[in-house]
Amino acid sequence: MSQPVLLLGAGRRCEYDEFVLTRIAAARPVVLVDAAPPDWARPHLDGHLAADPGKDGATASAVVRFAARHRVRGVLTCSGEYTVAAARIAGQLGLPGTSLATAAVCADPAALRALLTGGTVPVDDPGPPRVCAETVVLDGEIRIAALTRTTLGPAPARQPLRHTVHAHDGLLHNRFLRLAVDRTVHALGVTRGVLHIGLRLTDRGPRVTDVTPRLPGDLIPLLVRRATGVDLAQAAAALATGELPDTTPTRQRAAAIQFAYPAATGRLEHLDLSPDAAREPGADRMILTQHTGNQVTAGPHATTADRLALWAAVGDTPAACDDTLRRMARHLSATVVPFATAA
């Protein structure tokens, strides 16, 4: 096997996770570290190490034994639950990657806030309006590859309703946002990696709310690639293996994704997607993410697991993407029978 990268966990949802796996696998052989690889992941793998990434100690031992027989080039994960484990294993193998200390502090909101405050980083609680800096760091050079603007749903859950990436987003030139991102990276001591830095736009300027020290979810890497040409997944793989990432923009467009949540809490009785959605100009994809018969929770209290569908669009501007998303939404129909009336 030719110098693979180890991926801790394939992810739980093909609809969200397969894109990133395909991009990593296009650049380097991938060995999945997971108890059992999902069927959708198998075509993209060069190998499988049977170990539960959630069992940190046992997984580390299994990886060390594997690395004694194969030259492992890097360790990656796209799963929040395995970020600390991936950092620990990379450190044990002497490979590039997020430090254990950084991974641990990003997983603890109180510790992260204290660290950032001590590093003169302006912080705030999560909330609208929200923007995330898709940041690539290499040896002191901090590059914001793209900005993701997120429309949040109703409280208290405030789940994302839509993400939008625009190659010409005016905030890319906002010096206060760039300063907040730079200070965040320095406070965390990150010298190499891909970060998803969440910020809240306030009257006092951008305020950092959270930091994800790995690739973002929700198909944001897809949006970034469609809008700018920058491949965040391959950049993350390059950084994890000690190589130079290519973050040169090759596109000047916009891309957006929208999620449908149940209108009521109850049993999903009907869910249908017309194939005409794929024929809408600007449509990238539209996928059902729920099954009839399942119990679902309405938007204000929903989780990502309650989403009914996702659909993505590409256009010259965010407004063009919005128009396409609206047209695509007409091809989705759903009926939820509230629990109070369900038979």
Regions found by a protein language model. Name each.
Residues 123-206, 213:
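Internal nucleotide-binding/catalytic subdomain
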Residues 1-102, 106, 316-320, 324-331, ...:
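ATP-binding N-terminal substructure of ATP-dependent carboxylate-amine bond-forming enzymes
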Residues 6, 30, 237-343:
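Peripheral (often C-terminal) accessory segments that flank ATP-dependent C-N-forming ligase machineries
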Residues 176-197, 203, 212-270:
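Active-site "cap" helix and flanking loop/linker of ATP-utilizing ligase/carboxylase catalytic domains
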Residues 17-22, 113, 275-276:
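Short amphipathic alpha-helical segments and helix-helix/interface helices
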Residues 42-43, 157-158, 301-306:
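Short, flexible turn/loop "capping" segments at secondary-structure junctions
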Residues 104-121:
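Glycine-/Pro-rich loop/turn segments that contact NAD(P) or position catalytic residues
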